[in-house]
């Protein structure tokens, strides 16, 4: 097979050769350990699924400490250029630089490449230790908006010239008198746009249609923040009705029917929509949602939410099924085709080089990558092997200490077990 070819995109669709070149960022701390295990598992799955007809050619690019030590930069322009050119990449955890400049390398990558969806599927693998009674009821896919909200990075420190100007403008030009302690306040700005909302909700509904999911829930705090989070909810409903028509039934439609014809008619309309296989578009206030994912998780399927809510929700849900050590993630621009698949946990520097930590997060992010390429046969091999390996209680230390009768293995050995269990 040839040395490797570039993935291309035409009309928003990936053209994937049989031997795609995929850039990878090894990651800091435990990054080399987990990448060593994960890359072998992904390669073995592709080999087994396609018997040598398909193969990934990895291309290393640099970010984080490794980049800084090599180039003096935490996120070299060359790395961004390579990912732009090759479209798809996978990365381990990165250290956030101490001091000024880039606040978070992960956020910088998302913003530079406009990766507007943070995709976080949450599902349970039988046998994984969980703090909840029925973790198997949790099966959701989170679409978190990645570029806006309070995480946009528009923030000014207490006492700075910028914050003084901003507070003065708010007080004098807009007659704002709600800043309780203006002399000692830092200020952050929360932009939420109709375009940003629309492309996120569109991606979530498209995913629900493509994967046979039953509902999309818009999670927000619009009861308090009416013109940002409330607008997110309203724009989401408007987009669903305008672009998807009879493929969906929204709670906004439900409310209109209830107002005009009564609740019985609205309930009947929703039941008929469900029976017809339409996707129900609904909403939930964030604090109530965080209760209900514990008390009735099987009522939720695909979730679309803003940046800050999505951060909380993704990690809270991950805890219900075993923690972020086994939580995959991807950052995707569904319009340009660019995507970075990533470990969702930190660098855990105290375990660096010990061949100890659980590589499942980056392995399962690799599964998302394979699915994104359309290589579902290889992705399924990894999932089934993960199910089999965990069910047999052969696990890394983080799970072994919480499981009766477990066999504790190293990071690399867990990868080897996964390869053995592929069938």
Curated annotation (Swiss-Prot):
Record-marked site positions (Critical for catalysis): 151, 221
Residues at which Mg(2+) binds: 311
Catalytic activity line of the entry: D-threo-isocitrate + NADP(+) = 2-oxoglutarate + CO2 + NADPH
Name of the protein this chain belongs to: Isocitrate dehydrogenase [NADP]
Matches recorded under InterPro entries: IsoCit/isopropylmalate_DH_CS (IPR019818), Isocitrate_DH_NADP_dimer_prok (IPR004439), IsoPropMal-DH-like_dom (IPR024084)
Protein's organism: Bacillus subtilis (strain 168)
Keyword Signal applies: no
Known role: Catalyzes the oxidative decarboxylation of isocitrate to 2-oxoglutarate and carbon dioxide with the concomitant reduction of NADP(+).
Lineage per the UniProt record: Bacteria, Bacillati, Bacillota, Bacilli, Bacillales
EC number: 1.1.1.42
Additional remark text: The enzyme can be phosphorylated in vitro by the E.coli isocitrate dehydrogenase kinase/phosphatase, but B.subtilis lacks such an enzyme.
Keyword Magnesium assigned: yes
Family annotation (Pfam families): Iso_dh
Single annotated GO MF: NAD binding
Residues that, per the record, bind NADP(+): 95, 345-351, 358, 397, 401
TM spans (from-to): none
Keywords from the UniProt entry: Glyoxylate bypass, Magnesium, Manganese, Metal-binding, NADP, Oxidoreductase, Tricarboxylic acid cycle
Quaternary data: Homodimer.
Free-text cofactor note: Binds 1 Mg(2+) or Mn(2+) ion per subunit.
Binding-site residues, D-threo-isocitrate: 104, 106, 110, 120, 144
């Amino acid at each position: 097979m040839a040395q490797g070819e570039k993935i291309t995109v035409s009309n928003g669709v990936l053209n994937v050769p049989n031997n795609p070149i995929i850039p990878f960022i090894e990651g800091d701390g435990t990054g080399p350990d987990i990448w060593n295990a994960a890359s072998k598992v992904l390669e073995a799955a592709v080999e087994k699924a396609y018997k040598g007809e398909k193969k990934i050619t990895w291309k290393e690019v640099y970010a984080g400490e490794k980049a800084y030590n090599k180039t003096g930069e935490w996120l070299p322009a060359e790395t961004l250029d390579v990912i732009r050119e090759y479209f798809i990449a996978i990365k381990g955890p990165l250290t956030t630089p101490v001091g000024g400049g880039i606040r978070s390398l992960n956020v910088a990558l998302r913003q530079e490449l406009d990766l507007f969806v943070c995709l976080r599927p949450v599902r349970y693998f039988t046998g994984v230790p969980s703090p909840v009674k029925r973790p198997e009821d949790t099966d959701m896919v989170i679409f978190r908006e990645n570029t806006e909200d309070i995480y946009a990075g528009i923030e000014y420190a207490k006492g700075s010239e910028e914050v003084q100007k901003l507070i003065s403008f708010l007080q004098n030009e807009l007659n704002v008198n709600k800043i309780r302690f203006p002399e000692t306040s830092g200020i952050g700005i929360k932009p939420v746009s109709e375009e940003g909302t629309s492309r996120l909700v569109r991606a979530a509904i498209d995913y629900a249609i493509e994967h046979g999911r039953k509902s999309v829930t818009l999670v927000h705090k619009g009861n308090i923040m009416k013109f940002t989070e409330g607008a997110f909810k309203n724009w989401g409903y408007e987009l669903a009705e305008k672009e998807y028509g009879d493929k969906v039934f929204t709670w906004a439609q439900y409310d209109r029917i209830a107002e005009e014809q009564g609740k019985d008619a609205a309930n009947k309309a929703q039941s008929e929509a469900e029976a017809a296989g339409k996707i129900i578009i609904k909403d939930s206030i964030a604090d109530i949602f965080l209760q209900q994912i514990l008390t009735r998780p099987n009522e939720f399927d695909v979730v679309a939410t803003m940046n800050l809510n999505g951060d909380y929700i993704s990690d809270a849900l991950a805890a219900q099924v075993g923690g972020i050590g086994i939580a995959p993630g991807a950052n995707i621009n569904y319009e340009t085709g660019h995507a970075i698949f990533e470990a969702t946990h930190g660098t855990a520097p105290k375990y660096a080089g010990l061949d100890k930590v659980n590589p499942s997060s980056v392995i399962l992010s690799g599964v998302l990558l394979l699915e994104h390429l359309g290589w579902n046969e290889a992705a399924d091999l990894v999932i089934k092997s993960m199910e089999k390996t965990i069910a047999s209680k052969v696990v890394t230390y983080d799970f072994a200490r919480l499981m009766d009768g477990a066999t504790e293995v190293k990071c690399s050995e867990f990868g080897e077990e996964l390869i053995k269990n592929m069938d």
